[in-house]
């Protein structure tokens, strides 16, 4: 079971169906490591998949990296699962720009959770991306201010057998025949209808 499936199994903690229906892309970073001593850093590897609005089908996964830092009195290490629900084409383009920073863009908001989260704030209604995180089984709207998302060229090359950009993978469908890709797309189709 994927991190996203685990999150969706708890209806009171899940991403509301309203946002799943509107989603144009999904980004999942399982097991992002966050650590700190005086200052803090976090780093994770994940995948991006984009929905084709004409065919309602999902792209093969493009591998991405999430990195960031923070200041202040911090000590310790924790593991966080991060989920980003991208609500429009502009949000996708920002993610693919390799200059995207969560928190630097007003288009990112902590996402609502649970069955009754339909009455969203104005910030969430204007957002391009809703962010969620889960730490030790607790799942809530995430604040990942300062985190940068970039394409993970090495992981894409290792998975697809050649150098591909995230844009080539999600828009041109290059790599759709790689064995695990159909299972990934089937999982997305179960939740994003």
Across the structure, where does each feature detected by a protein language model lie?
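Small-residue-enriched, tightly packed secondary-structure blocks
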Residues: 1-193
């Amino acid at each position: 079971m994927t991190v996203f499936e685990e999150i969706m199994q708890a209806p009171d903690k899940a991403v509301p169906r309203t946002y799943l229906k509107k989603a144009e892309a999904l980004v999942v970073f399982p097991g992002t490591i966050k650590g700190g001593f005086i200052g803090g850093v976090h780093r994770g590897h994940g995948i991006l998949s984009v929905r084709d609005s004409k065919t309602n089908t999902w792209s093969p996964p493009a591998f991405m990296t999430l990195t960031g830092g923070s200041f202040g009195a911090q000590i310790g290490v924790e593991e966080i699962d991060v989920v980003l629900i991208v609500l429009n084409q502009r949000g996708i383009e920002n993610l693919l720009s390799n200059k995207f920073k969560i928190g630097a863009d007003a288009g990112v908001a902590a996402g609502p959770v649970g069955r009754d989260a339909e009455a969203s704030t104005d910030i969430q209604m204007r957002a391009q991306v809703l962010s969620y995180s889960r730490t030790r089984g607790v799942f809530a709207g995430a604040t990942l201010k300062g985190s940068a998302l970039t394409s993970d060229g090495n992981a894409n090359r290792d998975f697809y057998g050649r150098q591909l950009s995230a844009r080539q993978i999600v828009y041109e469908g290059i790599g759709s025949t790689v064995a695990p890709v159909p299972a990934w797309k089937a999982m997305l189709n179960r939740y994003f209808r």
